[in-house]
Amino acid sequence: MSKIWEDAIKSNAWPFVEAKKILDSLNGQIPEKGYVLFETGYGPSGLPHIGTFGENARMVMVQKAFEQLSDIPTKLICFSDDMDGLRKVPSNIPNPEMVAQYMDMPLTSIPDTFGECESYGHYMNAKLRSFLDKFGFEYEFYSSTNCYKAGMFDEMLRMVLEKYDEIMELMLPTFREERKATYSPFMPICPKTGKVLQVPIEKWDAKAGTVTYKDKAGNYIEVPVTGGHCKLQWKPDFGMRWAALKVDYEMYGKDHLANARLYSEICRILGGKPPVQLCYELFLDENGEKISKSKGNSISIDDWLKYAPVESMALFMYQNPTRAKRLFFDVIPKNVDEYITFNQKYHLEEDRAKRFANPVYHIHHGNVPKIETFGITYSLLLNLTSVCNPSDKSVLWGFISKYEPKATPNTNPYLDHLAEFAIRYYNDFIKAHKSYLSPSEKHKVILQDILDMLSDIADQTEAEAIQKAIYDIGMKAGYENLRDYFKDLYQILLGQNEGPRLGTFIKLYGVQEMKKLVEGQL
């Protein structure tokens, strides 16, 4: 065994922990199909949200960790449940009243309200795929509609008929009495309307491969369960898919946890082996409510990428997948700065085991680019933007170039992008909410002390020395809690409750510019 393998197998980073579970489930052997199958799922009822991206990003982290532990080939599929009937019209799409006419129709049988693709489902699938492609995921896209209609699931659907009673015995105890009377694992597709029907099944014939139901007129309608003429209810569908595709690893949100036992048991009933599974916590919006594609109450993928690099979004996905996290615009600056810190630590670290534990290893699948920001963080750029209110990033670069003459937009493209992102974020989220504190007489004494200190120091004074001098002024002012002191300074000088380390900020902004800012409040 190589030292690299030993470090990876011992790692406590969660992608390696998951990868070890998969390897153990296989007893180190290559599956009969010749590869290990990772599956992610997507419900295209509404526009893909950031949670959809998150599942795929996390899945690839586990896939790449597995490839570090084993030379067994792997494959990732993204499965779209686009044959589901439309149950609710999303609020964040154009022409919702048009879509409302197609309730219970398969998503791939509804006209595209965006006017770009052959159906609503195809449009939603395209939105997901375009981003997965943009991020560089290597995957195969599976459409539920195509799988059912092409006969990929036919063998399993016939087996569901053969095991009908056993599956019903498993499912019925999970329902209320009213639902028990009408439930069947099969949902016929109406030959006349094309709708996905949730109707009682009057008769099922395993030999003929058909089910029979009553239409609204009381007529008995017999349809094959194969060839896309029926679809399974979502719980049996989950387990059937695991068995049909021989899935080895699946992730799902906490909303699936209560049904995970059913998925696994149905997979076993159909002769399959349930995959290793990871249940991740759901993202919450600013109000602590679950984010939803149909509500559109979340940051979209495009929203995040308007204000920050994609790596920061991947870091948010990596961190603590089994813990619920609030997902709103305020988390963006923090994740950008944490990514910068992790990136710098990774390249300073020589211990491979510690590198394996660093999130950026998994975000970049072991090929971590080296970025240089010269100690300039996203938060620092936001505060610089706050005081100089630039029309474009060239204004920020004027300060950056004085702070670090080596830095240029061409040689430091990451920093250049951060400057552009910071201006956008400031204009959209900070500018309108700035509220300045009018300085009291006590504050004016403090500001004068700061001004005197700035007048006495040279432009070459180190940031730490400036920070200590400001700290000493706060101590002298008699604050019981220096947090209150710095909060007052941020409110007076920046119009915000929070702010940067002032020593570093003054070095970036410039001593003379800072003197003008302080003088303006006296």
From Swiss-Prot:
Detail which positions bind ATP: K293
A GO biological process held by the record: lysyl-tRNA aminoacylation
**Which catalysed reactions does the entry list for this protein?**
tRNA(Lys) + L-lysine + ATP = L-lysyl-tRNA(Lys) + AMP + diphosphate
Q: Where is this motif: 'HIGH' region?
A: 44-52
> Which compartments is it annotated to reside in?
Cytoplasm
InterPro entries given in the database record = aa-tRNA-synth_I_codon-bd_sub2, aa-tRNA-synth_I_CS, aa_tRNA-synth_I_cd-bd_sf, Lys-tRNA-ligase, Rossmann-like_a/b/a_fold
Q: Name one GO molecular function term.
A: tRNA binding
Q: Where is this motif: 'KMSKS' region?
A: 290-294
Q: Which Pfam families does this entry report, sorted A to Z?
A: tRNA-synt_1f
**Gene3D superfamilies linked:** 1.10.10.350, HUPs
Please indicate if the UniProt record lists Transcription regulation as a keyword. Answer: no
One cellular component (GO) term of this entry: cytoplasm
| Top-level taxon of origin | Bacteria
Is NADP found in the keyword set?
A: no
Keywords attached to this Swiss-Prot or TrEMBL record, sorted alphabetically, are: Aminoacyl-tRNA synthetase, ATP-binding, Cytoplasm, Ligase, Nucleotide-binding, Protein biosynthesis
Q: What is its EC number?
A: 6.1.1.6
- Tell me which HAMAP family the record gives: Lys_tRNA_synth_class1
NCBIfam families linked to this entry: lysS_arch (TIGR00467), PRK00750.1-2 (NF001968)
Q: Which PANTHER family match?
A: LYSINE--TRNA LIGASE (PTHR37940:SF1)
- What protein family is recorded? Belongs to the class-I aminoacyl-tRNA synthetase family.
Q: What is this protein called?
A: Lysine--tRNA ligase
What organism does the record attribute this protein to? Rickettsia africae (strain ESF-5)
Instruction: Tell me the organism's taxonomic lineage.
Output: Bacteria, Pseudomonadati, Pseudomonadota, Alphaproteobacteria, Rickettsiales
Q: From the UniProt record, report the name of the gene that encodes this protein.
A: lysS
